[in-house]
């Protein structure tokens, strides 16, 4: 049966009806409405949604969960939330380029198990954490270029290490990468790391990257590239490699030394890499430099610890070792037993080569070796460490004596319950306990031989400070001073001796004791003997000085009083100066001496001249003639020696006249009387015989004063001669001469010489 006209129309619609049918199919296929300003294409078997340049601030929630390709480029999305891509198990291609994404929630892509390409370039990502890319087990292409990434965690790529083929991290701020994770990307074809801050590539990173086709390290901070067989494929040498390799490392500050010699030996024609260092190769093309100029310098150790380090066991010690070279040397340390030291709980090697040993042991005694090595060689330097062992505690003997063997050396022993009853307590005796001191006694330690010294340690109940005292081994007592009053003390005595087993000093406790000082403060003590003696000396000296001062003051007062009286008398007598009219001087009979010129005036004025009336002068002449005989007789008996001088009045003179002639009298108290008018007569009186008259001779007493005393071998004062010689004679002659006038007798009316104030002062002082 031939088909009719309608049957052919149902099977194949005419061309004019095709547009209408497409519109019907598109409308029927809309399970969900397409977001506003987005383009949705449902071309079987894929559903594509394109929302580019639509001004989105976040991922639209009305996206069909069956979408296969989603492009949200050139928008203002700031964050990717956990619910944005939930249940999109069919999504294969996700593009979020050129947004402002700075945050990606943990597990935001966990449901995208079928995702193969993820584009997050040109955003504001600062780091890539390990939980952000979790769940992407089928990821092939990861594009993270042109962000602000400074750090990539080592677990960030764990979900797709075996599947990723293209990794782009260009134009970021990366200083390092998890090179260990990169080395495990065995299917990696393209690795783009240009325009970063990478200065180091771990050696052996590209060993397993056999499928790597392109490596871009342009414009980083690489100084060197580690030697790797990967770069041989770029030369085509040897067997034909499965895939060619393109390596770009221009724009890096390459340090052209022997470490890059392997790279220089490769043949390159179109690369323009230049050298930055050393100075003689700066700005020269890497491939044009001869191989002979790629040189290295062996290490040289410039600073190390002293030849010997002395440390006490248990203390820390630091050993320094620094070296220079090209390339920079790496420093290692070898222990005395040959072990290579590294960072551990007890040792640490710093970046500058210093070795720190935090806790030293006796095994550390020996020579540590510092090894500095680089590509050109190595250098070594020994450092000797001497560990001083601490004193060891000697083990207790097998059978210690019950009361003589010392116990443990623990200052806290007296504080334990029952410690006061132990044998250790009974060995020490605290005697003479006061508020500030105590005397400790202990017996001799015969069971402990070789005692060097004793160590006394004590502390107070009020604080935790422990005081140590070292005393000789010969002492068995110790006086502890400067203790606080009213406090309890724990005191132990230890014996320091030589241990024969270890040849090291050891300590054993001799004994411990507890005591409490008196609570009352120390009373005031009397002054010591030497202080008292000094005080007495000062007191006696003060009394003596005060007495001398009082005596001097009294003497000055007396001198001033009598001096004023003498000056007044001198002023009174100076108005009518007297003169001496009858003066007789008995000398040795030398007329030459009498006729000689008068000497210079003596400072002692013996006599004063008094004006005498004429009647009295006549009587005086008779008395003078009478006394001449007696004077001659006495002159013979004296044998020419000088006799005493006296001034006598005449016998015929009355008592009143006698008082007038004698001049100023001196009372027993030493005061001078007024002068008399009677002329004095110089006579020599002996016994009671009358004096015979003789021719009158006048001598000037002042003129003959020098001749009178020249016969003596020592000077004599006229005043003393007149008082001690003339006065007694005058007294003796007074009885016989008192003739008619009792008052004119020599016994009752003595002629007194007038002395000056100076002579009187000398007499008073004596």
Swiss-Prot record:
Residues making up the signal peptide according to the UniProt record: 1-31
Regions that span the bilayer: 537-557
Q: Where is this region: Disordered?
A: 397-422, 568-601, 646-742
Give all residue intervals belonging to the LRRCT domain: 252-298
Quote the biased-composition stretches of kind Basic residues, using this chain's numbering.
Answer: 714-727
GO BP term, example: regulation of postsynaptic density assembly
Intrachain S-S bonds: 321-370
In this entry, the parts of the chain located on the Extracellular side of the membrane are 32-536
Sites of glycosylation?
87, 343
Instruction: List residues in topological domain: Cytoplasmic.
Output: 558-766
Listed under GO cellular component are:
cell surface; postsynaptic density membrane
The cellular location(s) given in this protein's UniProt record come to: Membrane; Synapse; Postsynaptic density membrane
Q: Which residues belong to any copy of the LRRNT domain?
A: 32-65
* Membrane-related topology note: Single-pass type I membrane protein
Q: Which residues carry this modification: Phosphoserine?
A: 713
Q: Which residue numbers delimit the Ig-like domain?
A: 299-386
Write out the ranges of the repeats annotated as LRR. 66-87, 90-111, 114-135, 138-159, 163-184, 187-208, 211-232
Report what the Swiss-Prot or TrEMBL entry states about this protein's PTMs. Answer: Glycosylated.
Q: How does it assemble?
A: Forms heteromeric complexes with LRFN2, LRFN4 and LRFN5; binding to LRFN2 and LRFN5 may be weaker than that to LRFN4. Also interacts with LRFN3. Forms homomeric complexes, but not across cell junctions. Interacts with DLG1, DLG2 and DLG4, but not with MAGI2, not CASK. Interacts with DLG3. Interacts with 2 AMPA receptor subunits GRIA1 and GRIA2 and NMDA receptor subunit GRIN1.
Which family does the similarity line name? Belongs to the LRFN family.
Protein name as it appears in the record? Leucine-rich repeat and fibronectin type III domain-containing protein 1
Species of the source: Rattus norvegicus
Instruction: Give the organism's phylogenetic lineage.
Output: Eukaryota, Metazoa, Chordata, Craniata, Vertebrata
């Amino acid at each position: 049966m031939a088909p009719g006209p309608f049957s052919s129309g149902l099977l194949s619609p005419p061309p004019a009806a095709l547009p209408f049918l497409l519109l019907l199919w598109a409308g029927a296929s809309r399970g969900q409405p397409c977001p506003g300003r987005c383009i949705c294409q449902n071309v079987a078997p894929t559903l594509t949604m394109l929302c580019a340049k639509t001004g989105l601030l976040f991922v639209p929630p009305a996206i069909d969960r069956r979408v296969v390709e989603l492009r949200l480029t050139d928008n203002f999305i700031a964050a990717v939330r956990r619910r944005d891509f939930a249940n999109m198990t069919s999504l294969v291609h996700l593009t979020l380029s050129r947004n402002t994404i700075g945050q990606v929630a943990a597990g935001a892509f966990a449901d995208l198990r079928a995702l193969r390409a993820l584009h997050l370039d040109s955003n504001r990502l600062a780091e890539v954490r390990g939980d952000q890319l979790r769940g992407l087990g089928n990821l092939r292409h990861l594009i993270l270029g042109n962000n602000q990434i400074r750090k990539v965690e080592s677990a960030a790529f764990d979900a797709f290490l075996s599947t990723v083929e293209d990794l782009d991290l260009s134009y970021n701020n990366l200083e390092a990468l998890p090179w260990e994770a990169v080395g495990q990307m065995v299917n990696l074809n393209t690795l783009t790391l240009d325009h970063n801050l990478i200065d180091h590539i771990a050696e052996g990173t590209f060993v397993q990257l056999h499928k790597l086709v392109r490596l871009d390290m342009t414009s980083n901070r690489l100084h060197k590239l580690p030697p790797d067989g990967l770069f041989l494929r770029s030369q085509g040498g040897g067997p034909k490699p499965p895939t060619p390799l393109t390596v770009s490392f221009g724009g890096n500050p390459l340090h052209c030394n022997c470490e890059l010699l392997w790279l220089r030996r490769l043949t390159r024609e179109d690369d323009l890499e230049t050298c930055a260092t050393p100075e003689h190769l700066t700005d020269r093309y890497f491939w044009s430099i001869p191989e002979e100029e790629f040189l290295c310098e062996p290490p040289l150790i410039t600073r190390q610890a002293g030849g010997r380090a002395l440390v006490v066991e248990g203390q820390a010690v630091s050993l320094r070792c620094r070296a220079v070279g090209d390339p920079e040397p790496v420093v290692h340390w070898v222990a005395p037993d040959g072990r290579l030291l590294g960072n551990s709980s007890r040792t640490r090697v710093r970046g500058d080569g210093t070795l720190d040993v935090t806790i030293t042991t006796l095994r550390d005694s020996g020579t540590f070796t510092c090894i500095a090595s680089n590509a050109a060689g190595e250098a070594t330097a020994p450092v000797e460490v001497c560990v001083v062992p601490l004193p060891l505690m000697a083990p207790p003997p097998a059978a210690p004596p019950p009361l003589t063997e010392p116990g443990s050396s623990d200052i806290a022993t007296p504080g334990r319950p029952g410690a006061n009853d132990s044998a250790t307590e009974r060995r020490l005796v605290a005697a003479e306990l006061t508020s500030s001191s105590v005397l400790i006694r202990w017996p001799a330690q015969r069971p402990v031989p070789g005692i060097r010294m004793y160590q006394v340690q004590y502390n107070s109940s009020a604080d935790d400070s422990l005081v140590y005292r070292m005393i000789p081994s010969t002492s068995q007592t110790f006086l502890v001073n400067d203790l606080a009053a009213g406090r309890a003390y724990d005191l132990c005595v230890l014996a320091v001796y030589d241990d024969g087993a270890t040849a090291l000093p050891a300590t054993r406790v001799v004994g411990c004791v507890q005591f409490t000082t008196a609570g009352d403060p120390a009373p005031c003590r009397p002054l010591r003997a030497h202080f008292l003696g000094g005080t007495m000396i000062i007191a006696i000296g003060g009394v003596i000085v005060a007495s001398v001062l009082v005596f001097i003051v009294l003497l000055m007062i007396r001198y001033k009083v009598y001096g004023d009286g003498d000056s007044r008398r001198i002023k009174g007598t100076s108005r009518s100066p007297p003169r001496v009219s009858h003066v007789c001087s008995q000398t040795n009979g030398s007329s030459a001496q009498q006729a000689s010129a008068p000497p210079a005036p003596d400072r002692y004025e013996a006599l004063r001249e008094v004006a005498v009336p004429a009647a009295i002068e006549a009587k005086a002449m008779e008395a003078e003639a009478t006394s001449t005989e007696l004077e001659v007789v006495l002159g013979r008996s004296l044998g020419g020696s000088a006799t005493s001088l006296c001034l006598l009045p005449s016998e015929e003179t009355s008592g009143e006249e006698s008082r007038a002639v004698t001049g100023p009298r001196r009372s027993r108290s030493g005061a001078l009387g007024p002068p008399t008018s009677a002329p004095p007569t110089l006579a020599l009186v002996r016994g009671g015989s009358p004096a015979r008259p003789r021719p009158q001779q006048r001598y000037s007493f002042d003129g003959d004063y020098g001749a009178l005393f020249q016969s003596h071998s020592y000077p004599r004062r006229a005043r003393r001669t007149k008082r001690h010689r003339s006065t007694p004679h005058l007294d003796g002659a007074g009885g016989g001469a008192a003739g008619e006038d009792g008052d004119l007798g020599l016994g009752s009316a003595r002629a007194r010489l007038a002395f000056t104030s100076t002579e009187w002062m000398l007499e008073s002082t004596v």
